[in-house]
């Protein structure tokens, strides 16, 4: 299914959620090939709701009768209600509560999205419990399920800009307790995959963006408010969240023993300076910067994902145009920045 490449703006949240959850033909085929229900752990985050809706839409288009179940504490009743409207079953659960976790329904396919990033500094113990201990509990609960587990490109550490991105085979050098705990998550999944013969794919995402949240939005909001744009992290990757979701769902079919790793990121090496200047032109506003670019950044090479799943449908340039129109119209955005400029791993 093709997103209109000439669309210059997205009208409202309803249209945005429709586009974000539009499955690709490859995603439809991938879910048609899988048997059993799909359980999404940690569905209440930024990416979870529309990924769950995409899974439901793709399954229906494939003619597959499948339960798609979203699990979260659901601090937002609105999120829970919206998922139900979309046909996604919801279950409230504190995943760290072993009894509640083990009472969840069986599912042949599991998407693991639970984790803690923002607020991890000062709550290091909870961060490690969520990011490293919980994966072990999930593997104990679902030892026979196929799992696609979200991780982060932060586990690589800083990559020379000249290299244009870390590859899955590169050595890991996580900075800060958040990134270290995410590596812990990966190692726990790898351990259970090896010892329990569990089919697992680990997805290193870097970074999913849409109109309401993401690194591109952070830069755009600073330019629109005529605030200085930090250049300490001078380069980045960004991928339309709908494309990231499509690839993540397809990754279930590539789960293996031992677990495999797939980077999910945009194909472009994006300069923060150039992004800001482009937004300045779109908004017709002056652009100010603070600091200077370093010769390294958090960057991922997603070439393997493109070989497996195809290239993203939405380019960074298209995404930036949509974001600019969204902000200029006063569209709703998250009040929580991504803190993409953080170089020491303190979130």
Question: Whereabouts are the PLM-identified features?
Answer:
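Amphipathic terminal alpha-helices
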Residues: 3-28, 316-347
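Glycine-rich Rossmann NAD(P)(H)-binding loop
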Residues: 204-208, 230-236, 260-270, 292-293, ...
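N-terminal Rossmann NAD(P)H-binding glycine-rich loop of SDR-like oxidoreductase domains
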Residues: 37-57
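NAD(P)H-binding glycine-rich loop region in Rossmannoid oxidoreductase-like domains
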Residues: 49, 74-78, 82-130
């Amino acid at each position: 299914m093709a997103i209109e490449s000439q669309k210059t703006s997205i009208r409202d949240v309803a249209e945005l959620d429709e586009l974000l959850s539009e499955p690709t033909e490859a995603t439809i085929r991938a879910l048609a090939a899988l048997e059993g229900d799909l359980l999404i752990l940690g569905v209440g985050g930024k990416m979870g709701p529309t990924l769950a809706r995409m899974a439901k839409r793709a399954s229906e288009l494939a003619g597959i009768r499948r339960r798609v179940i979203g699990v979260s504490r659901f601090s937002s009743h609105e999120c829970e209600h919206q998922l139900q409207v979309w046909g996604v079953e919801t279950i409230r659960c504190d995943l760290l509560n072993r009894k509640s976790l083990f009472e969840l329904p069986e599912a042949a396919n599991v998407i693991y999205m639970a984790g803690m990033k923002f607020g991890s500094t000062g709550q290091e113990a909870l961060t490690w419990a969520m990011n490293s201990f919980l994966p072990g509990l999930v593997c104990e609960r679902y030892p026979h399920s196929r799992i696609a587990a979200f991780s982060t490109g932060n586990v690589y550490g800083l990559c020379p800009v000249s290299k244009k991105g870390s590859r899955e085979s590169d050595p890991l050098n996580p900075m800060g307790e958040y990134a270290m705990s995410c590596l812990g998550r990966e190692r726990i999944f790898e351990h259970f995959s090896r010892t329990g013969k569990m089919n697992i794919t680990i997805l290193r995402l870097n970074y999913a963006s849409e109109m309401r949240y993401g690194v591109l939005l952070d830069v755009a909001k600073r330019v629109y408010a005529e605030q200085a744009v930090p250049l300490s992290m001078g380069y980045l990757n960004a991928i339309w969240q709908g494309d990231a979701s499509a690839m993540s769902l397809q990754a279930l079919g590539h789960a293996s023993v031992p677990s495999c790793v797939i980077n999910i990121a945009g194909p472009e090496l994006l300069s923060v300076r150039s992004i800001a200047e482009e937004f300045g032109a779109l908004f017709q506003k002056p652009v100010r910067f603070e600091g200077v670019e370093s010769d390294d950044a958090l960057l991922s090479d997603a070439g393997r994902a493109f070989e497996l799943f195809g290239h993203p449908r939405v380019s960074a340039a298209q995404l930036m145009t949509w974001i600019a129109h969204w902000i200029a119209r006063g569209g709703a955005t998250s009040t929580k920045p991504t803190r993409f400029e953080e170089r020491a791993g303190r979130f």
